[in-house]
């Protein structure tokens, strides 16, 4: 998902797992409609909070600012949700976490606290933490925008590997090369609406939207 700041990309992601409540329209997760209703004040709210909690476990989210628990080690961050939300036995959760930390290339830092990691390392821990819940889909909200330029590549490599495994991922990003090479579909938002939508080869080489052409040329220049 591409678009200028304020175009609605992050809001869209946050509506999928109801971190923000949509005011109109419908949200389906894996074909299942999230049921909504109006409360007594006329606000749109979930009809069944248990449904929302269940569906949230199917969506892993990786944030721009990592959102790791600072008082926990890397390993503790990764096992926290499986143990306390999914009731996975601790020894089983640790075994899976160790495997995931190897996968994202940060197993040697498993006993470190986040403050002692670089931004790229913290974001790879955040990806491992999201994967630990075995979600059907991963949501990435500008996962590299808070990183120093030299650290971006290590995170994109992990994300590319996940895409090659066939994982369903919705990625909000300004990394044009990554979007072009890795995605199966590109959506460009403008002022909350879809301005361009299609396969990357088509969108990047022959866009129908003049706004997207301007957006793309501006980012390629930088």
Predicted regions and their residues:
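Conserved ABC ATPase signature
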Residues: 113-117, 121
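A short, proline-enriched helix->beta-strand linker immediately N-terminal to the Walker B motif
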Residues: 132-136
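Catalytic Walker B motif of ABC-type/P-loop ATPase nucleotide-binding domains
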Residues: 138-141
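Helix N-cap at the start of a conserved alpha-helix in ABC-type nucleotide-binding domains
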Residues: 149-151
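ABC ATPase "signature
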Residues: 197-198
